[in-house]
Amino acid sequence: TAFATPIAIAIPPKVDRFIIDTYCPAVVTKSFPQSGITVFGAFPHTHLQGQSVWTKIIRNKKAVEYLFNAEAYNFNYQFENILPKPIKLYPGDELATRCVYHTTNKNEISLGGEKTKDEMCMHMFMYYPRMKNFYGCSTINSLESWSRLMNSSASSFDFEVFRKWLIELKWTPELSEQWQNFYNNAPRVVVSGPTNNITLTNLARLPDYEDLKPAECKRSIINTAIRSVFLSMSFTLTSFFVTIASRFF
């Protein structure tokens, strides 16, 4: 999850596809019970510009499966999704989450925030047994990385100056491409733990991992399914016409 703040989410306008990746490292899940927790539901959430949200389970630097994949996300059509089968998470597991945005309909930057016109990147899960010392895992781009991008040498980070700078940026395709590169490589700060006792973990960059292999298209299965549907429709239509004919003859 990325915090709903401009420090975490600042998406250029007029971009067909902008990616924000977040990462929950092993240090966050080390307090999970040794027997694991069982995830049985998922609720992905962005605002109007979001197109897809997914979270992968990373185990020993290798993606083992999707925890959930909302490949075709729509803000106006949101669900609490019950998983086809429960999934176990264990101490030391890591979670990689990606939100993808489409902003070709916008003329100004989209910033993280709670208003519908702002943006979010969240993936919430239902699980058991309950853990009292675990609330969530969120990331922001480090303040130092933003200061370097702004070419600022100020001794402290001024959030109002930062927000004003973002809003006044003049966007070009080249700047949007540079912006994506910044997001791909910027150091992150991971915020985790209960709200009254949060833990901050620094990531020099998003960790690398061996990704899932692309799923193969089962063309023969698809063709068989289409053929079955076609035959079923043909039989239904034939029965319909026979019924109609019997009424007139």
PLM regions with names:
Residues 244-249:
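C-terminal membrane-anchoring or membrane-association module
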